[in-house]
Amino acid sequence: MRVLVAMSGGVDSSVAAARAVEAGHDVIGVHLALHKDAQQTREKARGCCSLEDSADARRICDKLGIPFYVWDFSEEFKEAVIGDFVDSYARGETPNPCLRCNEKIKFAALLRKGMALGFDAVATGHYATIDSDGYMRRSLDENKDQSYVLGVITKEELDHCFFPIGDTPKPQIREEAKRHGFSTAAKPDSYDICFIPDGNTQAFLGRSIGLRPGMIVDTEGNELKEHDGAWNYTIGQRKGLDIKTPTADGSPRYVTDIDAATGTVTVGSRADLAVTHIEADRLKYLHPAMEGDFDCEVQVRAHGSVVPCHAHVDREADRMTLELNEPLSGVARGQAAVLYLPSPDELGDIVLGSGTICGTE
């Protein structure tokens, strides 16, 4: 099988490439160039797309004796990921750019190009598995499971993917990399937003969106202070509110709602963050069971709590509603709601699909 391995320059994709070679596949490594800024480095950040990362990926491919290429997806990334990130915050949402990158670039765009060039599959270093029926499962390594950030791809895309390291504990991956003599064996994991290398999201959004003054109010509508832009805030935020007027009982305040149209940011108690009803659109399907009415579990952030719920999915309307069996806090518009079926066997939970949260109660 002709396999294209997406090489981030980290230890996970390094070992994924090695395992693909060991399995006897015809393998090439590809690093995705997502930025035009050639000066962006990893020196002060833990992103995944720097010049240093590209050089690390090349060294691994050289050691494995496989071809290495850099494919430029910077224009697609700018529009589909960075543009979406800015637009979502401007709408008062809380997007996850890594999910959008997986959805639009690392799978959709990469697969299109790979298939056009005659490749049979794309392999990545993600922690998830695909069962014998072709459905995605959680990794059994719960601490590293990445099925949530993969829940936004389609079944058609999944059919051309595989995850060589999906169920292997991370310490074992690092040991395997050491045995291969890979320079990435001890390389730290990436977690920063790659297009905000200094980690200052508010400054980035301020430059991108500009000042849009509005008011912070309490749940009774009382005005507490003016702000420079609703994009400064996310649902569940407690730090950085800088509200001088204390609550009657001295309890902390949290952001409970953002109305981007009026610029109004509402703050309330921790109890005000609890939701038991979620609505989502922009649905993605990974399993035929994601249709009609059914019981399942939902996760709304990477490594977040998993809550049982009853789902109603209307494929024709591209809409789903979730009635939660127990409250979830800090659920924001723009986040992904990924649905799971509890595992019926020794493998991880089954990933049904996902939707983008557009409303809560």
UniProtKB/Swiss-Prot annotation:
- Give the top-level enzyme category: transferase
Outline the segment boundaries, as ranges, of region: Interaction with tRNA. 144-146
InterPro entries xrefs: MnmA-like (IPR004506), MnmA-like_C (IPR046885), MnmA-like_central (IPR046884), MnmA-like_central_sf (IPR023382), Rossmann-like_a/b/a_fold (IPR014729)
Give yes or no: UniProt keyword Cytoplasm: yes
- What are the GO cellular component annotations? cytoplasm
Indicate the residues that form the catalytic site: C101, C194
Q: GO annotations under biological process?
A: tRNA wobble position uridine thiolation
Q: Where is this site: Interaction with tRNA?
A: H126, Q335
Which residues hold ATP?
Answer: A6, M7, S8, G9, G10, V11, D12, S13, L32, G125
**Is-annotated flag, keyword Transmembrane?**
no
Which reaction(s) are listed as its catalytic activity? S-sulfanyl-L-cysteinyl-[protein] + uridine(34) in tRNA + AH2 + ATP = 2-thiouridine(34) in tRNA + L-cysteinyl-[protein] + A + AMP + diphosphate + H(+)
Q: Where in the cell is it found?
A: Cytoplasm
Extract the GO molecular function terms from the UniProt entry.
ATP binding; tRNA binding; tRNA-uridine 2-sulfurtransferase activity
- Residue pairs linked by disulfide bridges in the UniProt entry: C101-C194
Please provide the record's keywords in A-Z order.
ATP-binding, Cytoplasm, Disulfide bond, Nucleotide-binding, RNA-binding, Transferase, tRNA processing, tRNA-binding
Please state the protein's primary subcellular location: cytoplasm
Q: Give the protein's biological function.
A: Catalyzes the 2-thiolation of uridine at the wobble position (U34) of tRNA, leading to the formation of s(2)U34.
The entry sums up its family as follows: Belongs to the MnmA/TRMU family.
- What's the protein called, per UniProt? tRNA-specific 2-thiouridylase MnmA
Question: What species does this protein belong to?
Answer: Corynebacterium aurimucosum (strain ATCC 700975 / DSM 44827 / CIP 107346 / CN-1) (Corynebacterium nigricans)
Per the record, the gene is mnmA
